């Protein structure tokens, strides 16, 4: 019941409960278990609501990253579940200082992730090299892999990582679907 959507995009009331319309144009039919909307919006809604990051903890920021998965903060309630394998993940959280010797390993893990893939740089060291201005330290993860979201701080609190994931969800919701994985 509720409303019927016409070809012009307007909704005609037919009685019963009204439709719930989200900000991205999806129409939810309460009680019917149905969703109507553009294909991009439906796919992005599903992908943004179920981010599966692989952790790449390199230093003290990794402790704060682990705290976000613990009971007090609980990332699972947002649909964010840490994965053990990059082949099952769609996001990589790089937390800490990236040495030049570790850079090829980071690139290899990134290449093993399926498309679409995202990178979240957590902490000052991952964002810009931090205090370690050295010949042995990469000055930012973005020199090795493309970074989508930067979470600054030394170390950033779990709430800052939450904010980074929310920004990543906003990026995912604005994307257009790619029909070919080979581009």
From Swiss-Prot:
Entry EC no(s): 7.1.1.-
Q: What does the record give as cofactor?
A: [4Fe-4S] cluster
Q: Does the keyword Translocase apply?
A: yes
Binding note for cofactor:
Binds 1 [4Fe-4S] cluster.
Question: InterPro entries annotated for this entry?
Answer: NADH_UbQ_OxRdtase-like_20kDa, NADH_UQ_OxRdtase_20Kd_su
Keyword Transcription regulation listed: no
* Positions contributing to [4Fe-4S] cluster binding: 60-61, 125, 154
Assembly notes: NDH-1 is composed of 14 different subunits. Subunits NuoB, C, D, E, F, and G constitute the peripheral sector of the complex.
This chain's function reads: NDH-1 shuttles electrons from NADH, via FMN and iron-sulfur (Fe-S) centers, to quinones in the respiratory chain. The immediate electron acceptor for the enzyme in this species is believed to be ubiquinone. Couples the redox reaction to proton translocation (for every two electrons transferred, four hydrogen ions are translocated across the cytoplasmic membrane), and thus conserves the redox energy in a proton gradient.
What protein name is recorded for this chain?
NADH-quinone oxidoreductase subunit B
* Organism expressing this protein natively: Desulfovibrio desulfuricans (strain ATCC 27774 / DSM 6949 / MB)
């Amino acid at each position: 019941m509720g409303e019927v959507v016409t070809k012009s995009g307007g909704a005609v009331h037919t009685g019963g409960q009204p439709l719930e319309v989200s900000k991205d144009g999806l129409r939810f039919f309460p009680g019917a278990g149905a969703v109507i909307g553009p294909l991009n919006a439906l796919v992005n809604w599903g992908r943004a609501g179920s981010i599966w990051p692989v952790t790449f903890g390199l230093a003290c920021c990794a402790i704060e990253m682990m705290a976000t998965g613990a009971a007090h903060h609980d990332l699972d309630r947002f649909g964010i579940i840490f994965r053990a394998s990059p082949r099952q993940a769609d996001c990589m959280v790089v937390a800490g200082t990236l040495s030049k010797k570790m850079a090829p390993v980071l690139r290899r893990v990134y290449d093993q992730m399926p498309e679409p893939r995202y990178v979240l740089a957590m902490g000052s060291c991952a964002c810009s090299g931090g205090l370690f201005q050295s010949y042995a330290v990469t000055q930012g993860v973005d020199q090795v892999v493309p970074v989508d979201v930067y979470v600054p701080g030394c170390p950033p609190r779990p709430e800052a990582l939450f904010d980074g994931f929310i920004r990543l969800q906003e990026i995912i919701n604005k994307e257009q679907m790619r029909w070919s994985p080979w581009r």
